[in-house]
């Protein structure tokens, strides 16, 4: 079967997923592809494991930016693809291979037929962690080419191909990682009175955390704490000296995030006192909410609905986290969901996006960018 140029690019990228700030092969692939465009109006900068590309406009008055995240996830792939990951224990399970491919397609179209305004493409590492958007935004490499408008997309397995979904205002939640390390006194299982059991302490903590949302967050607001991993102990007959909880916090408002963290800290302090142990809280990476610029989003939705073949859906906000929110704090813009019709969802080992969505996205985004960046 003959596949299109950009489907092949997606498959090439799918084979080489890499985690945050280790995307060296992916960066090399992007740079090699850009090299084939060989256009005098293209400038390229390297930032860590990312790439920033500028296509000079014919008569620029503003800079339009497109951001694509490029990293993969530490997940063992189960798709059965012939082009499955060749990196053991790694997979593009969040669609960043599609995001990057669409960016390269849009870049190709921009070089082929230049618009009036400058275009800047941000191939950003480490969206899945520890977070590449904020340091890229603050980098010297980007300051010179900082966009006036920026857009980004994320694949949506639940929507059919040929649809996009977005909304004005809040789209994605504030998110924070959560790590709690407990240290007590280990001992023999036959003498529990001489030890401080950190398995029991961790169990109490998980249970108490369930009250944080239900009794501290306005029912008309929304927030969630998920503890996804607990570790502790060594063997079955030794009382654990240490335990560790790992999870996430997600809120729809900045105020709720602050309130939730305050309650977590109070509960952990209570665990310390009750179990005579030491506790350390680490919030790890935190991502700011994705808040779409109202006027630009409304304009985009209207254009896509009236001027392209894509169907536009007004969605509700999601508890998903995205470090693109940091870019939208400083640069007016928006993010949208791109339908890819997969039976399995994001971060699943069997995620199989419909590749037909790739060229549909390139075509309609090229239409939008040409309309937005060309003086009438």
Curated annotation (Swiss-Prot):
It comes from the Bacteria. The keyword Transit peptide does not apply. InterPro entries: AcetylDAP_deacetylase, Amidohydrolase, Bact_exopeptidase_dim_dom, Peptidase_M20, Peptidase_M20_dimer. Pfam families: M20_dimer (PF07687), Peptidase_M20 (PF01546). The active site is at residues 69, 128. It catalyses: N-acetyl-(2S,6S)-2,6-diaminopimelate + H2O = (2S,6S)-2,6-diaminopimelate + acetate. The keyword Iron does not apply. GO terms for molecular function: N-acetyldiaminopimelate deacetylase activity. It is an enzyme of class 3 (hydrolase). Pathway: Amino-acid biosynthesis; L-lysine biosynthesis via DAP pathway; LL-2,6-diaminopimelate from (S)-tetrahydrodipicolinate (acetylase route): step 3/3. Coiled coil: none annotated. Its EC number is 3.5.1.47. GO terms for biological process: diaminopimelate biosynthetic process; lysine biosynthetic process via diaminopimelate. Keywords: Amino-acid biosynthesis, Diaminopimelate biosynthesis, Hydrolase, Lysine biosynthesis. Belongs to the peptidase M20A family. N-acetyldiaminopimelate deacetylase subfamily. Catalyzes the conversion of N-acetyl-diaminopimelate to diaminopimelate and acetate. NCBIfam families: amidohydrolases (TIGR01891). PANTHER family: N-ACETYLDIAMINOPIMELATE DEACETYLASE, PEPTIDASE M20 FAMILY MEMBER. This is N-acetyldiaminopimelate deacetylase.
